[in-house]
Structure formats: structure tokens, C-alpha cells
């Protein structure tokens, strides 16, 4: 299983973003995407970091670009152009 780190910025309050993120948990589980860490930088709730474990990075990419999921992430305040995605070694 690959690990993927996403660092991103959000435009809405962290609590709102996290609530929407959590609401997608069952959808992520259906495609074997597991949350390892979800949080924000100390002192900066607008800069979030998420570490996922995935069967392969393409599964996560497909999930993120699914129109329904993308719309929900946009509603949560995700600033997509700020996102940096790093596939980590095992």
C-alpha cells in the first residue's frame, strides 16, 4: 500500500472543512483509501495536511477528480491550486 501526503490550503473554517472531509469517509473506504493523519499546521488552521494509505496513487486521483467528490471538496473550501501531492516510499 502506498502512502500519499497532501498539503493544501482552505478558504473556510477548519471545522467546516473537517466536517465535510469526515462525511466522505465511507466513500473513501469503498475504494480502500485509509486516513493515517488529518490535521492542520500549529497556529494556521488554513494549511492542512492529510496522509492517506492507498492501494495505488491512481485510486486516490480518481477519487479526488470524481465530479461528486470534487464538488464536495470545493464546497468545503479546498483551494485546489494550492494542493501539493507527494507519493511517499514505503
Residues covered by each model-derived region:
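Short S/T/G/P-rich N-terminal loop/turn motif that feeds into the first structured element of a domain
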Residues: 1-70, 79-90
Amino acid at each position: 500500500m502506498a502512502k500519499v501526503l497532501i498539503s493544501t490550503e482552505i478558504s473556510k473554517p477548519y471545522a467546516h472543512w473537517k466536517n465535510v472531509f469526515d462525511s466522505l469517509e465511507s466513500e473513501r473506504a469503498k475504494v480502500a483509501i485509509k486516513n493515517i493523519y488529518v490535521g492542520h499546521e500549529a497556529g494556521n488552521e488554513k494549511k492542512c495536511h492529510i496522509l492517506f494509505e492507498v492501494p495505488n496513487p491512481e485510486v486516490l486521483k480518481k477519487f479526488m477528480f470524481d465530479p461528486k467528490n470534487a464538488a464536495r471538496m470545493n464546497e468545503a473550501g479546498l483551494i485546489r491550486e494550492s494542493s501539493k501531492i507527494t507519493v511517499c516510499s514505503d
